[in-house]
């Protein structure tokens, strides 16, 4: 909504433009009227819309054509004043003023016009019969007001309508020729309906309508008022109400009715509450609220955000199979201007045997987006109506900014829940196998993945000491030197192929170049351990290398298994990320890993039991 309103009054000489302004300000008819009133500013606190309003007079005797053109270009709304007792001034509305204004304004964003019939005190008839054809001919005319500066009749109403034409314009909402709402308005209201339909049954029930009424207008509707609204819809269209709920068709009809009856401020209140600007686009302020992220801090979703996402998943999981089918996912994204997830997402998070994103996979993808691109996450939550449905100031309330990692190292504990692991190794050493194994996929399932659907990321939950954490794996492409972005992480997984004698040398070189003197813990993984192991062409063996650099011994790993691959290395990687201060002696201790793994096993079993219990409730 505009921050202020600039109203320009034009018209033939002596129709009463200046008198109208002076009568508004002094609340009495002036005995002496100057040729032109000075610009007047009405403060926000005395206007109905709480917006500062500037009223500008035009005098043909005192101002040039150039000055008039400048005033037109600066105005938000123009009042064309005529005298109801002067036919010449009425004729000039169409022969001079409307063409002049339209010549000076962009065709795609015509200025709203108000026709003002002054001096109604001098006649006993109305000029409306003459004016109505003009209003029908020019769609930029918002309304016509007959008034009297002498009797103070409709003076405040005139300026209220002018304000309203700027702050709540009809143009973006409604096409008078077609007598229906414009496509952009229908699209915006359809999104609002889908967000408000919290059980996704295609209708707004009484509870949903009451919530909608409260968040938009700060007041609930009485039961009888709700019934009256539905009766109005029933009276006009047959399929506007179903099962005592308002359908999308009924919802759109109501707003069409508001606009046709001059109540378009009601529709604008709804649109603006859901983040729309005057062009019916979602505002940057709504989609991208301010969120300060200091250096060495990461971004995670908080508990309230996960609850919201859980309810979003449940809303669209219509068959209750704990996975979103392509159609269910498409339905979820109908409130987005585009489909945000590509086929690579299905290979980034957990899916069921049909390749559909599971409940856990859904939450994981949101966790990944928040961590890697928090602005994109805020945008997506905005499309879903997070701040509205949770009654928060903005989507920023869904995000936790973690403390500086240096503080974690000093205090020897972390509050983070998401840990990034960069997976490094030569091409074809088995990195993608490690990523897919995190999602529980063995080699047979991995072979079904199309090349163009592959992902360089994988994310899933891992239990360490009974705590659920997210492990985010990032496959780093092979290169001679790593960039700073490729080095920054919580833990490094250096992968080599036991069957390729040239594979380990790269891991050793990268470790020495970038990680030997850093505080980032590293784990070496001996991939494809089901194959015949060959001697690595390096000065010392991988085992001796680990011993020399006080690292845990190489971890044998294969995804060529009948069932899901072992998750041991993921528990170890997450543990190392959580406790980077732990000594290498502890990391090599079997008791240390046993405690971590035992906690993971117990909580995985408990988690599965709770998951089944939730399923039964659903």
UniProtKB/Swiss-Prot annotation:
It is found in: Mitochondrion outer membrane. GO terms for cellular component: membrane; mitochondrial outer membrane; mitochondrion. GTP 1 binds at residues 14, 16-19, 59, 118-119, 121, 149-150. The keyword Membrane applies. Mg(2+) 1 binds at residues 18, 35, 57. Ca(2+) 2 binds at residues 317, 319, 321, 323, 328. Residues 184-219, 304-339 form the EF-hand domain. Gene3D superfamilies: EF-hand (1.10.238.10), P-loop containing nucleotide triphosphate hydrolases (3.40.50.300). It is a single-pass type IV membrane protein. Keywords: Acetylation, Calcium, GTP-binding, Hydrolase, Isopeptide bond, Membrane, Metal-binding, Mitochondrion, Mitochondrion outer membrane, Nucleotide-binding, Repeat, Transmembrane, Transmembrane helix, Ubl conjugation. The chain crosses the membrane at residues 593-615. One of its GO terms (biological process) is regulation of mitochondrion organization. Ubiquitinated by PRKN during mitophagy, leading to its degradation and enhancement of mitophagy. Deubiquitinated by USP30. Residues 616-618 are mitochondrial intermembrane. The Miro 2 domain is necessary for efficient ubiquitination by PRKN. Homodimer. Interacts with the kinesin-binding proteins TRAK1/OIP106 and TRAK2/GRIF1, forming a link between mitochondria and the trafficking apparatus of the microtubules. Interacts with RAP1GDS1. Interacts with ARMCX1. Found in a complex with KIF5B, OGT, RHOT2 and TRAK1. NCBIfam families: small_GTP (TIGR00231). This is Mitochondrial Rho GTPase 1. It comes from Homo sapiens.
């Amino acid at each position: 909504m505009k921050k202020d309103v600039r109203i320009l009054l034009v018209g033939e000489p002596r129709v009463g433009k200046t008198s109208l302004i002076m009568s508004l300000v002094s609340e009495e008819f002036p005995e002496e009227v100057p040729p032109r009133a000075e610009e007047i500013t009405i403060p926000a606190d005395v206007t109905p819309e709480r917006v500062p309003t500037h009223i500008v007079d035009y005098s043909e005797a005192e101002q040039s054509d150039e000055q008039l053109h400048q005033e037109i270009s600066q105005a938000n709304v123009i009042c064309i004043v005529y005298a109801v007792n002067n036919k010449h001034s009425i004729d000039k509305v169409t022969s001079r003023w409307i063409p002049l204004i339209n010549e000076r304004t962009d065709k795609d964003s015509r200025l709203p016009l108000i026709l003002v019939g002054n001096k109604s005190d001098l006649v006993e008839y109305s000029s409306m019969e003459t004016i109505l054809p003009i209003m029908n001919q020019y769609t930029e005319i918002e309304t016509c007001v007959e008034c009297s500066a002498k009797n103070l009749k409709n003076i405040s109403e005139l300026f209220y309508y002018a304000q309203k034409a700027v702050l709540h314009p009809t143009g973006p909402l409604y096409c008078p020729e077609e007598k229906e709402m414009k496509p952009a308005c229908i699209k915006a209201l359809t999104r609002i309906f889908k967000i408000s339909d919290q059980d996704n049954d295609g209708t707004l029930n009484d509870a949903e309508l009451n919530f909608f009424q409260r968040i938009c207008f700060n007041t609930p509707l009485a039961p009888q008022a709700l019934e009256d609204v539905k009766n109005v819809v029933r009276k006009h269209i047959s399929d506007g109400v179903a099962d005592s709920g308002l359908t999308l068709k009924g919802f759109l009809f109501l707003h069409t009715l508001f606009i046709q009856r001059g109540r378009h401020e009601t529709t604008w209140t709804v649109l603006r509450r859901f983040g729309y600007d005057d062009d019916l686009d979602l505002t940057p302020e709504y989609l991208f609220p301010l969120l300060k992220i200091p250096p060495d801090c990461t971004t995670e979703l908080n508990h309230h955000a996960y609850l919201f996402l859980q309810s979003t998943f449940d809303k669209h999981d219509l068959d209750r199979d704990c996975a979103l089918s392509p159609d269910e996912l498409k339905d979820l994204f109908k409130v987005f201007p585009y489909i945000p997830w590509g086929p690579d997402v299905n290979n980034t998070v957990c899916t069921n045997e049909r390749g559909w994103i599971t409940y856990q996979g859904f939450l994981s993808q949101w966790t990944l987006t928040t961590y890697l691109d928090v602005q994109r996450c805020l945008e997506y939550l905005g499309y879903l109506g997070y701040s509205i449905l949770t009654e928060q100031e903005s989507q920023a309330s869904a995000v936790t900014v973690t403390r500086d990692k240096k503080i974690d190292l000093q205090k020897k504990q972390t509050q983070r829940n998401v840990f990034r692991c960069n997976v490094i190794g030569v091409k074809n050493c088995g990195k993608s196998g490690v990523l897919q194994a995190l999602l529980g996929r063995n080699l047979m399932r991995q072979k079904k993945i199309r090349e163009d659907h592959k992902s360089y990321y994988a994310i899933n939950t891992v239990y360490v000491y009974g705590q659920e954490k997210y492990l985010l794996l990032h496959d780093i492409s092979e290169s001679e030197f790593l960039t700073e972005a490729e080095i920054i992480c919580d833990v490094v997984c250096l992968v080599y192929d036991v069957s390729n004698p040239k594979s380990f040398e790269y891991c050793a070189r990268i470790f020495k170049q970038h990680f030997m003197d850093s505080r980032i813990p590293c784990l070496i993984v001996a991939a494809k351990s089901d194959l015949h192991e060959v001697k690595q062409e390096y000065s010392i063996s991988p085992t001796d290398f680990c011993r020399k650099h006080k690292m845990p011994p190489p971890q044998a790993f294969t995804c060529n298994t009948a069932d899901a691959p072992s998750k041991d290395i993921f528990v170890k990687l997450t543990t190392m990320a959580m406790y980077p201060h732990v000594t290498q002696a502890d990391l090599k201790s079997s008791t240390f890993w046993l405690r971590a793994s035992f906690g993971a096993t117990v909580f995985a079993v408990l988690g599965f039991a709770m998951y089944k219990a939730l399923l039964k409730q659903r």
